[in-house]
Design a protein with these regions (language model features):
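Short, conserved beta-turn/loop elements at beta-strand boundaries and strand-helix junctions
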Residues: 143-145, 155-160
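Short coil-to-beta-strand transition motifs
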Residues: 19-21, 141-149
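Acidic-enriched and Gly/Ser
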Residues: 1-137, 163-194
Length: 194
């Protein structure tokens, strides 16, 4: 899998940030997140649809590498220019429904909106964060985990992962996100060999 914002989506993101937007979450069958996101992005020029993906560390036969995988299976974040009706956004190939709380139209607010804003800022991809050791403790210095430090509940220094707990739609989401060790050398940050 290789999800990333195209130049068209990057421009659309700038337009939405300038003009204002509403955010929603769609729910579909796991495995359809990429197909539906691509279809909606191609069919609606006022919309950004993105799954939430993460980079993960893997190792095979002593070789370390990173892979991209879906973090929230079945969920798609959708951002529409203010004033657009989410109910007019349709898929011709796949089923999805708009998640909503009781008595609302699905438009995100509060902590759910903050989370969706963070997903948009990350462009749907949680890259590998960077960390240093300070007195034997892990300190995140760059990347998506930097903004989630209050949500980190566990570190695996050996596997270079942090377990986070966040809440979306009142449900606790538990996930492991990767980091790489870096050295602080005379003020410059340099990547260590993997």
């Amino acid at each position: 899998m290789n999800w990333s914002f195209s130049s068209k989506l990057l421009q659309r993101k700038q337009d939405l940030l300038t003009s204002g937007y509403d955010a929603y979450v769609l729910f579909t069958l796991q495995g359809l997140e990429l197909d539906i996101s691509e279809e909606l992005n191609n069919n609606y020029d006022y919309c950004i649809a993105t799954p939430l993906t993460k980079m993960s560390h893997r190792s095979r036969s002593g070789n370390k590498y990173d892979v991209q995988e879906i973090l929230l299976g079945g969920y798609i974040f959708v951002y529409l220019r203010k004033g657009r009706d989410i109910n007019k956004v349709k898929s011709t190939k796949n089923y999805f429904r708009i998640l909503s709380r009781q008595n609302d139209d699905g438009r995100l607010c509060g902590k759910d909106l903050e989370y969706a804003d963070w997903v948009l800022e990350q462009e749907g991809v949680l890259s590998v964060s960077e960390a240093i050791k300070i007195n034997g403790m892990v300190k995140i210095v760059n990347g998506p985990l930097k903004n989630l430090e209050g949500s980190i509940v566990e570190y695996s220094k050996r596997n270079r992962n942090c377990r986070i707990e966040v809440e979306l739609f009142g449900q606790k989401i538990d996930a492991w996100l990767p980091f790489d060790w870096i050295d602080a050398d005379m003020g410059d940050l340099k990547m260590q060999q993997r």
